[in-house]
């Protein structure tokens, strides 16, 4: 039987990423054959990964990488926040973002076939990571954005990499694009414009806003405060020419009832119409980038600010770790019971 030296164990660990004991056991089982030991570790790793496949991985990091006129933002998940801070995990995320940006896959299936610097496919690299790190590690999603030479990328990560943003700006400069990405990270828009919102979605969100107003009015009634009116509209998509004309007519009637002279109406009406638009586009403000108040200049919307500096936003992508993943509630008593049962059965 071949002697299993510390040098041999170290060599296997460097090639496989396995722990000391796992590497030593593999060498013992393969009589010191490095290549067979690597294959054995890979098989064991796949078995370990398969056992973890059904676990929920909702922690992790985003990765952002810019490669010339192509940028990628990705999300990689782990089971715990602790592992998400692991140096091996962070390196895996950053490497994956680079491979995605350079490989430009069309979908997740294509991305899994890309070759990592280790020579493994991306899919195999994640199986290996699951085995060596000891938690389910999964590549969840990516977005690729391309720009022209005249446009600018804004790349930004927030909260230790839990949020990743890429934006493309025409006009302006890279600093403006980064500021815009910071806004996107903070304000969570999901689409660029009201034109991208589904009609039924707007109706549902408007109903929810009015439900909140109803709850607020119950509290106001208890302290004899006047009730707040319901919102009639939630999006610019609902503000037809007829609706806007009626709003202006209502404002004029209000000014006449207040006895305001007609010669000053032209100075008052624009401000009141701006207020009408603001009050009746609450859904747009929550979900569309252009309608949001710009965090770098709260006197303007994003759209108005960009117009003031002769710039426009072309596209953006925002990932936040765990979005849409339902986390399993941990039942501590059940977990302890299962652990004790397993121990008794061994």
Swiss-Prot record:
Query: Mind telling me which SUPFAM superfamilies this protein's record contains?
Result: Elongation factor Ts (EF-Ts), dimerisation domain, UBA-like
GO terms under cellular component: cytoplasm
- Give the Gene Ontology MF terms in alphabetical order: translation elongation factor activity
Instruction: Region Involved in Mg(2+) ion dislocation from EF-Tu: list its residue ranges.
Output: 80-83
Q: Which InterPro entries did the record assign?
A: EF-Ts_dimer_sf, Transl_elong_EFTs/EF1B, Transl_elong_EFTs/EF1B_dimer, Transl_elong_Ts_CS, UBA-like_sf
Query: Where does the protein end up?
Result: Cytoplasm
What does the UniProt keyword field contain?
Cytoplasm, Elongation factor, Protein biosynthesis
| Cited NCBIfam families | tsf (TIGR00116)
Instruction: Supply the PANTHER family for this chain.
Output: ELONGATION FACTOR TS, ELONGATION FACTOR TS, MITOCHONDRIAL
The task this protein performs is described as:
Associates with the EF-Tu.GDP complex and induces the exchange of GDP to GTP. It remains bound to the aminoacyl-tRNA.EF-Tu.GTP complex up to the GTP hydrolysis stage on the ribosome.
For this chain, the family text in UniProt reads: Belongs to the EF-Ts family.
> Could you tell me which HAMAP family the record lists for this protein?
EF_Ts
Q: What is this protein called?
A: Elongation factor Ts
Natural source organism? Streptococcus pneumoniae serotype 19F (strain G54)
